[in-house]
Swiss-Prot record:
It comes from Escherichia coli (strain K12). ATP binds at G37, P38, S39, G40, S41, G42, K43, T44. Residues 5-235 form the ABC transporter domain. Probably part of the ABC transporter complex YdcSTUV. Probably responsible for energy coupling to the transport system. This is Uncharacterized ABC transporter ATP-binding protein YdcT. Disruption phenotype: Inactivation of the gene does not significantly affect natural transformation. The gene is ydcT.
Length: 337
């Protein structure tokens, strides 16, 4: 099978710092693939390595089966969209999108036709004569995407492109990006530190930590079956039981993750514990409770909010509660390297 992008034991060193440390991944053609991780985890460096903006310290990269480690950026079948859209303020939107084609020597009539077509793909064909200052943040983002698409890349690289947008616009752009990727059928590689973005748009997600990949999986499997304590804590919220806590509370050997929404309050169950509510956080669709169990352990519990229901007086800070859960919702974890 020929992959869109393949890393074979790739490393990138800055002095003694291993920004990317022995990463191997295979990204499929036509896949929406996200690289998720905290700042400094290596995800953006990997994107820059694909684009050719960084040089490898070790390993190899191939793009559609062709060795790409030593290719200059302009010879790689990829284009990049950055968080800073870098639009030319004095140019029309049409000329902004057509700029790369002008540099390549494409004649004006042809490049304007291609730029207009790219704008149509992102539903902005009507703004071609405007200036960037006349557009909203979301529209400028789509212009930046059109400018990348006009070169007809087989892989589109997106480096935290939604980070500058407000929450509602960011959520709207997530839907639009996914629809665009599906309609184009090309590979999108999306870098983000936002788990919500990665889970909502991606076919698969690679979770980065300290220059390495902790897990590559579908969004559902990442959430429901995290493999390491880091993934369990970074993708969503988890209660992580180390060996001592698992043995004490559950009679089980090893480390486990338990999602807060899988714990029931004041309802008997297979495994039970008692504790005191320390804090209550109303979060709209759910309420989160921070508990201190009688043995001193801390536990997070999330309870869905039913329409019109008030929080019972028995579920306020200082109140004693019983919690329960089942063994089958506890996810075994492997120790981090």
């Amino acid at each position: 099978m020929t992959y869109a992008v393949e890393f074979d034991n790739v490393s990138r060193l800055y002095g003694d710092v291993r920004a990317v440390d022995g990463v191997s991944i295979a990204i499929k053609d036509g896949e929406f693939f996200s690289m998720l991780g905290p700042s400094g985890s290596g995800k953006t460096t990997c994107l820059r390595l694909i684009a050719g903006f960084e040089q490898l310290s070790g390993g190899a990269i191939s793009i559609f089966g062709k060795p790409a480690s030593n290719l200059p950026p302009w010879e790689r079948d990829v284009n990049t969209v950055f968080q800073d859209y870098a639009l030319f303020p004095h140019m029309s939107i049409l000329d902004n999108v057509a700029y790369g084609l002008m540099v390549k020597g494409v004649n004006k009539k042809q490049r304007h036709a291609m730029a207009q077509e790219a704008l149509e793909k992102v539903a902005l064909g009507f703004v071609h004569q405007r200036k960037p200052s006349q557009l909203s943040g979301g529209q400028r983002q789509r212009v930046a995407i059109a400018r990348a698409l006009v070169n007809e890349p087989r892989v589109l690289l997106l480096d935290e492109p939604l980070g500058a947008l407000d929450l509602k616009l960011r959520e709207q752009m997530q839907l639009e990006l996914k629809k665009l990727q599906q309609s184009l059928g090309i590979t999108f590689i999306f870098v983000t530190h936002d788990q919500g973005e990665a889970l909502s748009m991606s076919d698969r997600v690679a979770v980065f930590n300290n220059g390495r990949i902790e897990q590559v999986d579908s969004p559902r499997d990442l959430y429901m079956r995290p493999r390491t304590p880091f993934v369990a804590g970074f993708v969503g919220t988890s209660n992580v039981f180390d060996g001592l806590m698992a043995e004490k509370l559950c009679g089980m050997t090893g480390s486990f993750a338990l999602r807060p929404e899988h714990i029931r309050l004041n309802t008997p169950g297979e495994l039970q514990a008692n504790g005191t509510i320390q804090a209550v956080q109303y979060q709209g669709a759910a309420t989160r409770f921070e508990l201190k169990l009688n043995g001193g352990e801390k536990l997070l519990v999330s309870q869905a909010n039913m329409t019109g229901e008030e929080l019972p007086a028995t579920l306020t800070p200082g109140q004693q509660v019983m919690v329960s859960w089942s063994r089958d919702v506890m996810v075994p974890l492997v120790e981090e390297r």
